[in-house]
Amino acid sequence: MQRSLPSLAALVALALAAACSKPAPQQAAAGVQWGVIVLYNQPKDTAAFEKYYAEKHVPLFASHAQEIGVTRVELVKFPATIDGQRPALYRMADIRFESRAALEKGIATAGFKAAAADLANFATGGVTVLIGQKTN
């Protein structure tokens, strides 16, 4: 009886699960960052999404970054899954803050609320917005 080798995706998933299996500390150490993670689903029209995102949304957020108290922003586009398929997610924005208190203060600002309200103008596939704590 021959056994088939696990797929690359299964191996990557196992490696990630092993590497990430440590629970996050209850009390964050000094300097541990917090973030708002915005996960964008596939939009109905990617060209329209990209145009609005680059020309309107990102500049809108950037114009309020100081008010919001952002320390770092990373924008990621997902062209494919690891096995070459079209992913359910299209983009991700990782918006970092120096502490949980700074995050809570930032998301309460008029600038953050304006950027959040702007999502309806281009994120036609829907979004998921999460709060995350950096654990490494």
Model-derived regions, located:
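Sec-dependent N-terminal signal peptides
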Residues: S7-L14
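C-terminal motif of bacterial Sec signal peptides marking the signal peptidase cleavage site
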Residues: A15-A19
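Macromolecular interaction modules
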Residues: S4-S7, C20-N136
